[in-house]
Amino acid sequence: MQPSFRIVADGTDVTQQLNDRLLKLTLLDKPGMESDSLTLKIDDRDGQVALPRRGAVLEVHLGYAGEPLMRMGRFTVDTLQWAGPPDCLTVTAKAGDMRGSGKTIRSGGWEGTTLAQVCRDVGARNGWRVECPLQVAIARVDQVNESDYHFVTRLARQYDCTAKLAEGMLMVLPRQSGQSATGRRIEPLVLGRADVGSFDVTYDDRSLMRTVKTRYQLPGSGEVKSVELKNPKAPATATGEHVDRHLYASRGEAEQAAKARLASFSRSSASVRLELPGRGDLFAERSLLLQGFKAGIDGEFLIDSVEHTYSSSGWTTVVQCNGGRVGKG
């Protein structure tokens, strides 16, 4: 099959202008505020390539000739590099416009609220639409001399969520939920050995913890209490104990933080790298089910990142996975 692409810039299809000039297209998809990116390397051999407007919006589609192309996302141009010889223009764009007010350093606090409400408040002052289905109660949370990007990322990590800004929407979603931002069920994608060009699977017991401890302070008395969460999936050889130094405002927040930290350790228990012919149905936070590889390897993993590369050599996709919430003990 012949790979194909389409690029629309500020509403104008520029595919024909780029057909014989596009040297390389790279798309990176990761869970996180500043991760999703597009890089275009364009041949400017005759000096006729005009510099795109910084802030221009690029919409990218990938697929194969004779089939409907898949929309891969919309990106805002924020970096231009022209180098030579041979003359070449490199355009970098982000799924979230990272040039806006989200990087402003702020301080503030919330009491007696929910994670969803905090996200809505942050979104409102930056002009972002917000999707956060979690009504987790928050006794108190403070933003101290940090940007909204950093603050939301920190909150998401504490509650075992991902935070992503894309196309003007802030999405804060539970990790490995199996659902899209709209609540649509996303089934694990099954990959067999024949689907993959190359693979690399690593199990690492050093990241497994038997116990995670967090602390919280009782209102009024100020007495400090602790929460201990054991890992039921930890092998007998895992004896490590992680103690979170942060002091939480309530028992509920301390318990949630312990669960999130334990899930993070579990995800680090395995890493998988797969290289395969280009396909657009692979994306960060989708569960992947490996079948027909090897006993002890087959099973479910969670996609950490996806990198698509399109060039004259074809379209390839590289997938990085982790061990998921349960881990690979």
Q: Where are the language model's segments positioned?
A:
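Amphipathic, non-transmembrane alpha-helical segments in extracytoplasmic/periplasmic proteins
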Residues: 39-40, 93, 105-130, 143-167, ...
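Acidic/histidine-rich, surface-exposed loop or edge segments in extracytoplasmic proteins
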Residues: 99-104
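Assembly/oligomerization scaffold segments
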Residues: 1-98
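Conserved "cap/hinge" positions at secondary-structure junctions
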Residues: 62-64, 174, 286, 292
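An acidic/polar, Gly/Ser/Thr-rich interaction patch typically located in mid-to-C-terminal regions
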Residues: 21-53, 195-329
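Extracytoplasmic/secreted envelope proteins and their assembly/folding machinery
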Residues: 74, 116-119, 149-153, 211, ...
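Short beta-strand-centered interaction patches in the first periplasmic/extracellular domains
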Residues: 1, 88, 94-97, 132-196
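Short, compositionally biased
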Residues: 74-83, 108, 176-179, 301-312
